[in-house]
Amino acid sequence: ILDPFMGGGTSLIEAQRMGRNSIGIELQPDIARNSETLINIEHNDNCITKVITGDSRCYNINSLMEQFNIPAFQFVIMHPPYWDIIKFSDNINDLSNSHTLNEFLDSFGMVIDNTTKYLEKNRYCACVIGDKYANSQVIPLGFYCMNQFLERGFLLKAILVKNFGETKGKSNQQGIWRYRAI
């Protein structure tokens, strides 16, 4: 399993619990260190779990695969920043610091190009992302990101929609859709 937006390490923890080898790439060194500590609590001697600090747009994944004798990844899971809704760092390479939607999508496309070429044939890549609401309109980040995959020849297998009630991004605005519909 490859997670190019590792963040808190949830996918690596779950991979360990299932006995699956996993590699996570995180841009921010402090986040990578903290996540590695949490991941090591769930240590599983029966699988490889590796945390890498780097930029998923250009990290040399091939050398990593050679190091661990990995012929291909069987699953890639991407949970990128929701463009600029939450600024995760001051790093200019952080997708959450993209100045425009096109810049965000171009950078996201670079991650797709750099990671999915190592995906085993007939295997899957999942993208977890929410949409953005700004200037009285919905910006459908999920569909824009999905289109980045389609433009690269991926086949769409499913669109799963989950409404999270209370989140940091919604800031106590559970009734916002009712308000906007009126």
Task: Give the label of every model feature segment.
Residues I1-I182:
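Class I S-adenosyl-L-methionine-dependent methyltransferase catalytic core
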